[in-house]
Amino acid sequence: MATPDQKSPNVLLQNLCCRILGRSEADVAQQFQFAVRVIGSNFAPTVERDEFLVAEKIKKELIRQRREADAALFSELHRKLHSQGVLKNKWSILYLLLNLSEDPRKQASKVTSYASLFAQALPRDAHSTPYYYARPQTLPLNYQDRSTQAQSSGSLGSSGISSIGMCGLSGPTPVQPFLPGQSHQAPGVGDGLRQQLGPRLAWTLTGNQPSSQTPTSKGFPNALSRNLTRSRREGDPGGTLEVTEAALVRDILYVFQGIDGKNIKMSSTENCYKVEAKANLNKSLRDTAVRLAELGWLHNKIRKYADQRSLDRSFGLVGQSFCAALHQELKEYYRLLSVLHSQLQLEDDQGVNLGLESSLTLRRLLVWTYDPKIRLKTLAALVDHCQGRKGGELASAVHAYTKTGDPYMKSLVQHILSLVSHPVLSFLYRWIYDGELEDTYHEFFVASDPTVKTDRLWHDKYTLRKSMIPSFITMDQSRKVLLIGKSINFLHQVCHDQTPTTKMIAVTKSAESPRDAADLFTDLENAFQGKIDAAYFETSKYLLDVLNKKYSLLEHMQAMRRYLLLGQGDFIRHLMDLLKPELVRPATTLYQHNLTGILETAVRATNAQFDSPEILKRLDVRLLEVSPGDTGWDVFSLDYHVDGPIATVFTRECMSHYLRVFNFLWRAKRMEYILTDIRKGHMCNAKLLRNMPEFSGVLHQCHILASEMVHFIHQMQYYITFEVLECSWDELWNRVQQAQDLDHIIAAHEAFLNTITSRCLLDSNSRVLLNQLRAVFDQIIELQNAQDVMYRAALEELQRRLQFEEKKKQREIEGQWGVTAAEEEEENKRIREFQDSIPKMCSQLRILTHFYQGVVQQFLVLLTTSSDESLQFLSFRLDFNEHYKAREPRLRVSLGSRGRRSSHT
């Protein structure tokens, strides 16, 4: 018998079978026959013959192993290889290299597991249709260690083949040399044989070694048992259905997408996914499936919100950006699911065992979906937190989730925030650089009221929606943003300044994409703040320059001080002198054009004539509403017309304050004017009335009372002029000079008016004080009237006495009797009547003095109890010598206690 060639394929294959199984040639005859049949079959990988696809897999594998440099080197070498064209089968070489490189660490374990090769392959491959097996590149191939079965009763392979011989063949199957190139068995015979072998081998494999998986699987079910084991309890009376892990995996992948599986369905009552009660599962698999199904619930929650809000047009651009961000995250999630689905489909299509490390199990899904679950939980929390929000409020809700210590979660939310905030920043840059507000759905924190007219543009047309201010924008920044756009619109619409914005502001690059927005968020305190500050300062400076140079805002403010606050002393005094004959008349007899003529005369006769014509033409006379008994002094007022841009600072409310302050100052000035006339009367009539010694007591009382009134009015005028007007004006002027925007000027001006209004006793808290002060003013007018009557009576009496003496001297010169008895009696009677009227005059003066002092004392008591320190100090000045303190116990207690508190402090 010829010795077979030791290098022939038959001998090598037989030696390989002996080496793997560790048996003699006689014992491996049946396995050798099967091996020959397998080699002669049509097994081929089903991977697509794509050279570049394999190259990409190699690069990904290198990157996964953190060998980026090797991946780059491989890419360069592959490029050179492709360009040279020396090799013809590049795909085959790359595919070989890829398979050779896979999992070299598992080689040691494979040596001991070769014995199970045929035990695994026989039941699957002994049928008519050959399987095309291509192992996934991401999952390593592994065989179970079945070394323990060699110590059991016979080998699995021999028992399987003997059963085949007994059940399927009439005799032993001869070993045929199935070498490449030789003819195969007849198709009919081979097909029929394999159709009988398949189920018998499967049953033999599963029935003979039920415990062989236990030590090697370590809790992971074998892929063969998952795919081929069928429930034997389907006909049980309990109706329970044994579910394999493979079926659970398939259901879970559907649940991940929100689709009910065969065994896992959504419970509408409990709002969660639950495993069917009839499914026969151990507690571990059931709990794992429920944990995995949570991803489906999270997916449904996010998908439902995104789909519903995407169709809501009123949700606005910010909301649509949020929905787009959610869809983008779901897209990444779907990409993972597609990979898992392809892996599962590959296992089903191949029909071969991929090994424990290659198959999809619930525990592997639990590990692989750990990070996606965190992302979905974060997105679901965002969805809950953003319910009912839109615009800047929605951006604030997203921004709140960036304040976390988890870098993974923080990066996710920051990415979403960059998308969500992009419309807000687009609104913002359009507003600060163009002054345009295109906020159809009211998402921006700047609101516009189209019904407001131009004259109220600055005050009422543009406001802040505080609820829409994103939390990453401070209130100071939002106020500046409002002022920038408002300044641009004010210049265009009110000042009629059509200067392009680019000449006012150095326009920088805005947030043109979410990437720009993301970059901007990384430096909110510097880059973003710098843009806002630059636009704010440049726009505000340009606006103030226009108001000061073109519209003379500061000159108009000084004109208010000179004319309405009586700062132009010579003009006011001369105007009073000219108006006195007119204003003493009843108010109903006055005509405005007459008073306007007098005003123009006073302007031409004083330094007011040197003011700008623009200012003088705005100065006018105004008559207040007339009440019964009013004189011209009660209804006369100066007015200053404002319009255009300056009306934004000098609003109607401000002009109303000016009018009230002017009336108060005008009345106080009139009191000073009256007391001056009283003092003139004293000085002029003192010499004339020396010949009437009986009238000296009246003159003395008038002089004392007038002196008290002069002291009071002088102190009040000093307080009003210096402590109120001058100090407040100096503070206003300093603030106006330092103002950075128009709002600062308006605020300073309003604060100035509020200060002088309250300190001039014109606010609601000082009505009692003002009434007392008006009562003092009324007593001054009463003194003037009483003194005029007394002087008139005294001068008439003096005139009659002089006439009597003159007549007497004239008669004596003519040689007649100077006076007859009847004439002398009549003269004496008239003198007695005059002398009898003097006590009445003195009594009237005493009553007037008493009433005046009582009013002043009450006024001082009110001053000491005022919360304004300047008014408290005014009480010291008015009663510096404690004249009224000695007369009024309440004043004495109040002043004493206040003095003790001051000294103690």
From Swiss-Prot:
Keyword 4Fe-4S part of the UniProt annotation: no
Gene3D superfamilies for the chain: Gamma-tubulin complex, C-terminal domain
Keywords: Acetylation, Cytoplasm, Cytoskeleton, Microtubule, Phosphoprotein
GO function terms (MF aspect): gamma-tubulin binding
InterPro entries: GCP, GCP_C, GCP_C_sf, GCP_N
Biased composition (Polar residues): 206-228
Localization terms from the record: Cytoplasm, Cytoskeleton, Microtubule organizing center, Centrosome
Entry protein name: Gamma-tubulin complex component 3
Gene: Tubgcp3
One Pfam family from the record: GCP_C_terminal
Record family assignment: Belongs to the TUBGCP family.
A GO-annotated cellular component: centriole
Function: Component of the gamma-tubulin ring complex (gTuRC) which mediates microtubule nucleation. The gTuRC regulates the minus-end nucleation of alpha-beta tubulin heterodimers that grow into microtubule protafilaments, a critical step in centrosome duplication and spindle formation.
Lineage, top ranks: Eukaryota, Metazoa, Chordata, Craniata, Vertebrata
Self-association state and partner proteins as the record states: Component of the gamma-tubulin ring complex (gTuRC) consisting of TUBGCP2, TUBGCP3, TUBGCP4, TUBGCP5 and TUBGCP6 and gamma-tubulin TUBG1 or TUBG2. TUBGCP2, TUBGCP3, TUBGCP4, TUBGCP5 and TUBGCP6 assemble in a 5:5:2:1:1 stoichiometry; each is associated with a gamma-tubulin, thereby arranging 14 gamma-tubulins in a helical manner. Gamma-tubulin at the first position is blocked by TUBGCP3 at the last position, allowing 13 protafilaments to grow into a microtubule.
Region annotated Disordered, chain positions: 174-193, 206-239
Positions of post-translational N-acetylalanine modification: 2
Organism in which the protein naturally occurs: Mus musculus
